[in-house]
Structures are given as C-alpha cells and as structure tokens.
Design a protein with these regions (language model features):
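Switch/communication elements of ASCE P-loop NTPase nucleotide-binding domains
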Residues: 1, 131-234
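Phosphate-coordinating catalytic segments in nucleotide- and nucleic-acid-processing enzymes
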Residues: 1-167, 234
Length: 234
C-alpha cells in the first residue's frame, strides 16, 4: 500500500475506528484514521503501562528474502513501504541466538521445529545473508529455500535469540500459508506447548478449516480454553 488511508474501505462513509477495553483499569487501546491519512494515525490512545513481554507479528509472507530491502526502506530511504510490524520483525531477527540462556520449553520446541524443516536457517555475518543448512550439512541460499521452511525458521530464530519470553504475545497471519498439513500440525503443537509452559499468548488468523480442526483437537487435550472468533458478512 502507498499510504495508511488505503486500509480504509473505499465505500466507507467514515474513517476506520478501533477501540479495545481490557478488564484492567487504564488499559484501553483506541485509534482512528481516514482515507486521506498518509502515514500517521489521526487519534490514538494507548495504555501507559506496557506488557513485560515482547510482542511480535508474523505475516503470511516470510520476510527473510526481503530482509535487506525492508531494512533499507526504513533506515536509509525513509520510505513508507513496509509497516512497523515488518520492521519490528526483521529487527528482532537481527538478534543473534543466545547460548546457554534459553528456556527448556523453547529448546524442546526448537528441536521439534528442526525435525519439521530437516535442518535450520541461519545468518552469515560475513556475507550478510540468510542461508538454509539441511541435516546432511548442505547449504542453500535463502532464495532457493522453500517458503514453508523459511516461515517456520522465523519462529525458531525468535525462540533462540531470547526475543520471546514469558508473557510474550505472538500474532500470526494465515499460519497455514506455504505449510503442508504435517507441518501445520507440528507448528500448532509447538505453539500450544510454549503457550502452556511459558504463558505466551498466541493470536492466529486463518481461512483454513484444517487449522481450526487441529486447534479443536488441541483444546480437547488440555484444560485451557482455545477461543475461536468467526467473522462473517451480514
């Protein structure tokens, strides 16, 4: 999108307005902007106190292939091409994995993810590029790596470098995108594990009945409720 106002429905008589009220005092979030908004929100009210854990948004499209482009557009060109959620994600991915300081739940989750992608994605500091290394030790450029592998590897990196912690919040758009059914199941099992053991809250948007069904099966196995919100027209 060229400007923020493009997010407003063309036929809408008024601008876009959002308001969310928490059950805690002074924890309301509200903002609004019109079709003419370029890059700034017109009115915004945010909580004074921030959550202790980091929050991150994982888009449907992986960002490893666009990594240098996103950084350059924001830090060099100063252009409005990628919103802050993309910029925040690539900045979080820049953090190198920490050794010996990770939670056991994260280590177990990373082990499961490594089996799904049959290897791992890492960053080469010398070349400044991402690469995929399979379990046989073969290296591949990130451009020649499957979309699903890159998507899962983003989560692996965030678990490894300490960006995610207890009470973090993860927003995932179209989790099923570029993933085969087995990978979807493993990914959701991993999210359920870290959510249960670490208190991480996960919000998932999906168009897939398969994802909803898997979440239903997960909910049957654990006492914690899995909330599902269905949106429809009319």
């Amino acid at each position: 999108t060229d400007k923020l106002g493009d997010l407003v429905t063309r036929s809408a008589a008024e601008g876009l307005t959002f308001k969310m009220q928490s059950d805690q005092q002074d924890m309301a979030l509200e903002y609004q902007f019109s079709q003419s908004a370029a890059s700034k929100v017109g009115t915004a009210v945010a909580p004074a106190a921030q959550k202790p854990g980091n929050s991150i948004f994982l888009p449907a499209k992986e960002v490893l292939s666009l990594f240098p482009i996103i950084l350059k557009s924001r830090e060099v060109d100063r252009s409005f091409g990628f919103d802050d959620t993309y910029y925040d994600l690539v900045k979080a991915l820049q953090i190198a994995p920490s050794r010996g300081k990770n939670f056991s739940a994260f280590a177990d989750a990373r082990e499961e993810l490594s089996h799904v992608v049959d290897g791992k994605v890492d960053f080469d500091d010398n070349s400044g590029k991402w690469y995929y290394k399979n379990s046989s030790g073969q290296k591949f450029s990130i451009g020649a790596t499957a979309e699903g592998v890159k998507k899962i590897s983003i989560m692996d990196r965030l678990l490894a470098n300490g960006y995610l912690s207890k009470d973090s919040v993860i927003f995932i758009d179209e989790l099923e995108s570029a993933l085969h059914p087995t990978a979807i199941c493993k990914f959701l099992d991993m999210l359920a594990q870290v959510s249960k053991e670490m208190g991480i809250q996960v919000f998932i948007s999906t168009h897939s009945y398969f994802v909803i069904k898997k979440m239903y099966l997960i909910a049957l196995k654990q006492p914690e409720a899995v909330t599902c919100i269905s949106l429809s027209r009319g």
